[in-house]
Structure formats: C-alpha cells, structure tokens
C-alpha cells in the first residue's frame, strides 16, 4: 500500500510517495522520467545495494547514467559538488535532463544544489535511502554543501519534482544510521505534535524491529508535518524555523568534532537535550518534560549530552555563525511543551554558558 502526501507550493507542488518496494514501481516514476536523460547521483555505499535495481526500472524511460561519490558528511563540499557538474558537462546533459538523488541526506542535498545551479535549474527527484533523509532532508527544498567554517552555508531553496520513499531501504541501513534518523523523528513530536511524541514512546520496539506499519506511519506523520510547515513558509521566514529544534547546538557539535565523526542525527539528539535544558533554565518547561525527551532519545541509543571535549567557547564560536543569527543575536528554537516550540532571540550567553557547562 502506497501513501501519498502533497507539498502544496502552487505551480511547484509535488508529491511524496511512501511505501514498500516503491523503487520497483515504474508507474510511480514514469510521469517524471519519460523520454528524459537521467543522471543518478549516489554513493559508494548505496550503489552496490540499489543502483542496478533502479537503473533497470528507469532504462525504460530514457538514457540512464550514474555518478558515484564517496560516502560521508566530510565529502559534502564544493569539490565533490563539482564532480556532479563535471559528469553533466562531459556527457552533454541539457536543461531537459533529470538528476536523481539516490542516497541519504548528503547525496540529496548535493544533488538538489547541483540541480538548482546547472544551467540555472534542471529537474531532480529525491529517492532517500536513510531514515533521516526520508523524514527530513528530502522534503522541503533545502539544498546545500558545507564549508569548513560552517554546515550548509552554501546552498539554495530548490524543490524536487517528486520524493519517493521506499521503506524497504531501511532494512539495509546500519543500526547507528537508523538511530540517527530517529532523532529527527522525535524532533517532530517535540516541536509540533504531542500525540505523535506519545505514540513514539509507545512504539519504540515496533520501530526498532522495522515493522512496516509502524515505519510507514512514523515517516508519513513526519512528512505531513514537514509538508504543512513548508507550504506555509518555504524559505524559513517564520514557522519553518521551528524545524531547527536542536540544530543550533547540533551544528556546533558537528563542526567542532569534524563532519562525519558525529552523525547529523546524533548531534541533533544531543542538541535537542541542550535546547530542552535551556528551556528548563528559562522556566519554559519543567524537569519532567526534559526527562521524557531524554528517555525517548536514549531508547533509540542516541547521545543525550555533548562531547566532553567541547566547552562553552567551542559552542559559542560556531553558534554565532548559525544561519538563524539576526542582528548579531543567536536565535534558538526551544520547546515550550511536548508538541510545541518557539524561537527565542533573547537568550543570554551567560544562560547558555550555565546550561552547557552543567550539562
């Protein structure tokens, strides 16, 4: 059974298809690929698992080629972005071509950014293969590469034509990667939907066993929330900022520790706890809410504290470069309950120092 969710952006609206074995569903793909030149962008981990399978489906639509990049956040940079451009140019791809992102968040972000830039914009499709990319990065049109001084600092908003989520991919996903994806799933419950958070608390084992019904529901609910938020605020001028819960602290951890040493979801998990502790210190939530957040993250074997090697100065240096900074003020997304959050710009550095040093 396939579930469909629509991201409503007027002429740039697109569907999200969610279900089992969708990569074999030529009907789902045909509308977007028929008589097109197709370049699949994937990585060295995903290619042996799924590249031949998806090529066999797509070859009936048009000419299909691929470019295989190294796997890892540390390769999400301008050098490897250029490898996509080189493949497009060497093979004379035109504006009627389609890029297909087959992989996790790194591949999706880089492929989308390449699509946004190449000949001032060509179509692309997201086929996310990790839980994190299925519930978050593949939806909403954020595309980017990293810079040594900051994560996702070079990018664009550019929407895909289609997001195709095949839950079967999660059965080849390492346990650590699955857990990292759950950090983003849990985030949606904290910042938007308290009933979903409670459902997650009650379905930990079903999700860890990769039960199809539980996976489809969790992924669908996350995509519904993301689609709703993006439809209201595509370029993050308002409510979309709430999706960054845990990310200001989390991006600081990733940048300080070196991209790839902590998975993005692991950094978001620790960052979410720091955000909750900051909210508690400001009197926005009580200790019981912090405990529920910590316990749910721990149930999926996620880190709930920052690396011991990071001190306040390390955090603040990176947080001052965060994309949400306005007028020199660090802006934090903080929970104000289970199922609700807000953006705060008046959190003092002394408060942050107390939270970070006592965490």
Swiss-Prot record:
A single GO cellular-component term on record: cytoplasm
Main location: cytoplasm
A Pfam cross-reference name: DHQS_C
Localization annotation: Cytoplasm
Keywords: Amino-acid biosynthesis, Aromatic amino acid biosynthesis, Cobalt, Cytoplasm, Lyase, Metal-binding, NAD, Nucleotide-binding, Zinc
Cofactor binding description: Binds 1 divalent metal cation per subunit. Can use either Co(2+) or Zn(2+).
GO terms for biological process, alphabetical: amino acid biosynthetic process; aromatic amino acid family biosynthetic process; chorismate biosynthetic process
Cofactor (UniProt): Co(2+); Zn(2+); NAD(+)
Record-listed E.C. numbers: 4.2.3.4
Binding residue positions for Zn(2+): 184, 247, 264
Recorded superkingdom: Bacteria
Pathway: Metabolic intermediate biosynthesis; chorismate biosynthesis; chorismate from D-erythrose 4-phosphate and phosphoenolpyruvate: step 2/7
GO molecular function, one term: 3-dehydroquinate synthase activity
Reactions it catalyzes: 7-phospho-2-dehydro-3-deoxy-D-arabino-heptonate = 3-dehydroquinate + phosphate
Database matches in SUPFAM superfamilies: Dehydroquinate synthase-like
Binding-site residues for NAD(+), renumbered to this chain: 71-76, 105-109, 129-130, 142, 151, 169-172
Similarity remark: Belongs to the sugar phosphate cyclases superfamily. Dehydroquinate synthase family.
Function text: Catalyzes the conversion of 3-deoxy-D-arabino-heptulosonate 7-phosphate (DAHP) to dehydroquinate (DHQ).
Name the UniProt record assigns to this protein: 3-dehydroquinate synthase
Species of origin: Shewanella putrefaciens (strain CN-32 / ATCC BAA-453)
Phylogenetic classification of the source organism: Bacteria, Pseudomonadati, Pseudomonadota, Gammaproteobacteria, Alteromonadales
Record gene name: aroB
């Amino acid at each position: 059974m396939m579930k469909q969710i629509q991201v409503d952006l007027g002429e740039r609206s697109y569907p999200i298809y969610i279900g089992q074995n969708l990569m074999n569903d030529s009907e789902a793909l045909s509308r977007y690929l028929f008589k097109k030149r197709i370049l699949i962008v994937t990585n060295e981990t995903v290619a042996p698992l799924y590249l031949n399978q998806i090529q066999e489906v797509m070859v009936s639509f048009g000419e299909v080629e691929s470019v295989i990049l190294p796997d890892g956040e540390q390769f999400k940079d301008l050098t490897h972005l250029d490898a996509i451009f080189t493949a497009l140019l060497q093979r004379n791809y035109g504006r009627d071509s389609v890029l297909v992102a087959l992989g996790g968040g790194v591949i999706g972000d880089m492929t989308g950014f390449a699509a946004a830039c190449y000949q001032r914009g060509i179509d692309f499709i997201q086929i996310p293969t990790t839980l994190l990319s299925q519930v978050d990065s593949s939806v909403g049109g954020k595309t980017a590469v990293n810079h040594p001084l900051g994560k996702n600092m070079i990018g664009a908003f550019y929407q895909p034509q289609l997001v195709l989520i095949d839950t079967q991919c999660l059965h080849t996903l390492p346990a650590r990667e699955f857990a990292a994806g759950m950090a983003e799933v849990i985030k949606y419950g904290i910042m938007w939907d308290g009933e979903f958070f409670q459902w997650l608390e009650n379905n930990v084992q079903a999700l860890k066993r990769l039960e199809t019904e539980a996976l489809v529901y969790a992924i669908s609910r996350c995509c519904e929330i993301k689609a709703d938020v993006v439809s209201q605020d595509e370029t993050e001028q308002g409510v979309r900022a709430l999706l960054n819960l845990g990310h200001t602290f989390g991006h600081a951890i990733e940048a300080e520790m070196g991209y790839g040493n902590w998975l993005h979801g692991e950094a978001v998990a620790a960052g979410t706890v720091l955000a909750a502790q900051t909210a508690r210190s400001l009197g926005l939530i009580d200790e019981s809410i912090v405990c529920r957040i910590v316990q749910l993250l721990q149930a999926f074997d996620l880190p709930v504290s920052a690396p011991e090697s990071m001190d306040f100065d390390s955090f603040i240096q990176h947080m001052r470069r965060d994309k949400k900074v306005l007028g020199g003020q660090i802006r934090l997304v903080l929970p104000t309950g289970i199922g609700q959050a807000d953006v705060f710009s008046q959190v003092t550095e002394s408060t942050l120092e107390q939270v970070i040093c006592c965490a």
